[in-house]
Regions:
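A structural signal for short, well-ordered beta-strand segments
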Residues: 58, 110-112
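N-terminal strand-loop-strand beta-hairpin
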Residues: 1-93, 132-156
Length: 156
């Protein structure tokens, strides 16, 4: 395939919900990701199309403990935690992540910066995946958090 290995990371993603609106119904996400001693606060807006998980994302490096304290003080509350091992590769202008998500299993995630034509970028990604034997129809738009919460609900 020719993909270049970029390393392995352990991610601990803690998601928060708003006291004013329910992110699960507005299709938004707010998380603090801890990776290798660094923490990043990320806000993800609503998905932009009906076939991919493309959405606006804004992130900034933070002190994890301070960011948690600020969110809690503002009334935000923890909505779930996702723990995963991520093996990263780069191929052309794509980032490929082989994820092993605790309690869920194995996944492949392919990203490309979509500063311009989203449809064109999606076509490139789906073409790449088809080369690996993964059909467009097999792709999922459900987030790891949604899957973790659904699995938790099924257990109760």
């Amino acid at each position: 395939m020719g993909a270049k290995p970029e390393g392995i990371q352990e991610h601990l993603d803690t998601y928060y919900n708003s006291p004013v609106r329910d992110f699960s119904t507005t299709d938004e996400a707010l998380r603090i990701r801890s990776v290798n001693g660094r923490s990043v606060l990320t806000y993800k807006g609503k998905k932009l199309d009906s076939v991919s998980k493309t959405r606006p994302e804004f992130e900034t490096e933070v002190d994890g403990d301070s960011a948690r304290s600020i969110l809690i003080a503002l009334g935000f509350f923890e909505s779930g935690v996702v723990s995963k091992r991520r093996e990263l590769f780069s191929y052309r202008n794509m980032t490929i992540a082989l994820d092993s998500v605790e309690g869920l299993g194995e996944f492949i995630e392919v990203e490309e910066q979509a500063d311009c034509n989203i449809e064109e970028r999606c076509d490139e990604i789906f073409s790449f995946l088809e080369g690996l034997g993964i059909r467009k129809e097999d792709s999922i738009r459900t987030s790891y958090l949604e899957m973790v919460l659904e699995k938790k609900k099924e257990k109760n």
